[in-house]
């Protein structure tokens, strides 16, 4: 962030800026989670969650909650991803996160997510590397989603959700072939669609 954070022009105008980022878009199983964070103007140690160890993410998630003016999470379940597609489900989770914020933001920054909004919006690629609010949102989203996947691992043992968090790995592929898709797998994704059905179909 050598050139200054993305939200700096909004901060200079005195606007409340919400950063949004998601976790789980490319996973084969589990929800998409979007974090929304409003930070006061300043400098922060927050980085893209993908660059952090799980322990560092947990520690920084607590820091985000301490310093944020507001934060919220929105979730789109696997069934909604199947019904709507990845982009629309991500936008739905983002809408839920924004509606859950206790403060109404006056400008938005996202990581290449084209939110339909009347508010001023910056949505460049790799915004989580250039914006502390987006990085903070990515940390909250990732930590929350990891906890969901840990719980799903207990509900649906054998898939390795606690290890791969629902993403495509050889272990996950082999579990799908052996067990078939679980109720929290995304049936639209080819590796899931091609696996033999063992669980009853949801109504």
Curated annotation (Swiss-Prot):
Compartment(s) where it occurs, according to its Swiss-Prot or TrEMBL record: Cytoplasm
Cofactor (UniProt): Mn(2+); Mg(2+)
Residues annotated to bind a divalent metal cation: 21-22, 111
InterPro entries per record: RNase_HII, RNase_HII/HIII, RNase_HII/HIII_dom, RNaseH-like_sf, RNaseH_sf
Cellular component aspect of the GO annotation: cytoplasm; ribonuclease H2 complex
Predominant cellular place of this UniProt entry's protein: cytoplasm
Top EC class for this record: hydrolase
Entry keywords, A to Z: Cytoplasm, Endonuclease, Hydrolase, Manganese, Metal-binding, Nuclease
Residues that span the membrane, as ranges: none
Family membership noted in the UniProt record: Belongs to the RNase HII family.
Name of the protein described by the UniProt record: Ribonuclease HII
Species: Thermus thermophilus (strain ATCC 27634 / DSM 579 / HB8)
